[in-house]
Amino acid sequence: MQAGKALKTAAAFMLSVAMLATGAACGTSDDSDASASKSSSKSSELTGYDVSGVKKDDAIAKMLPDYVTKDGKLTIGMDTSYAPAEFLAADGKTPVGFDVDIAKALAGVFGLEADPETANFDSIIPAVGAKYDIGISSFTVTKERLEAVDFVSHFNAGSAWAVKKGNPNKVDTSDLCGKKVAVQTATMQETAANKMAKQCKADGKAEMDVISSKLQTDVTTNVVTGKADVFYADSPVAGYAIAQTDGELETLGKTEGIAPEGIVVKKGDQQMDEALQK
């Protein structure tokens, strides 16, 4: 299902703003090096797009199911390790990023208070319709996910590879056997990487080590610190990380696998589906 005009316009604008920003970077895990920590502080300085002018649309608000409107809040599950889409501000608590702004804009249209909640990426889809009203966290629309939930797509993105500057480990994405590949847990990139690893084994080649992390910030850090040879992520996230790590990372190859990304809705919830498409 496709998003309505307002949602698509907001998504395109906020994504372009985020990708043009030059004063921010992915955060890091506790074991990151000094340069990665420095880039983390930059990430926290980003401010969101002002959506306070978004007004309630009574006709759309009336379409919402009771379970969404009863508490006056739009509760959104999101993985806040995924800059520039969603990450935490300098206080370490406040979600910011273009997905957060989209969530706030939607809440404004619905006449609700936006309540973005931090969650591990792989825990969001199972909780939509119960703990969360919707999920917004750069979810690629896949056949497998559509078996569990509905999606309203709002923009397209691909996947990209990132390595240390100069590709010192001679990574060739056409043959990753013998390499260490960092990915985020439960992403389509993890699925693809595991498939490649199985093929290496089937072909009798050197083992490909897939390093999965719950947080995208840790995925990026694994390459910066040398724990992994390359990471594989959504193209906006990869491009953002590369641009903001003080020249430590670079893109390897071209963006591939362009596919729709979307907002997660409870399976069969026609009211919410239609409200998001207006």
Enumerate the predicted regions with their spans.
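Bilobed "Venus flytrap"/periplasmic-binding protein-like clamshell domains
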Residues: 95-108, 139-141, 157-215, 230, ...
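Sec-dependent bacterial lipoprotein signal peptides
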Residues: 1-24
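Bacterial lipoprotein signal-peptidase II cleavage site
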Residues: 22-38
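Acidic, polar ligand-binding/catalytic clefts
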Residues: 113-174
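Extended ligand-binding regions for polar small-molecule ligands
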Residues: 27, 41-58, 108, 167, ...
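Extracytoplasmic small-molecule ligand-binding "clamshell" domains
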Residues: 42-135
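Periplasmic-binding protein-like
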Residues: 80, 155-163, 243-277
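A ligand-binding cleft/hinge motif common to bilobed small-molecule-binding domains
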Residues: 139-146, 194-195, 224-257
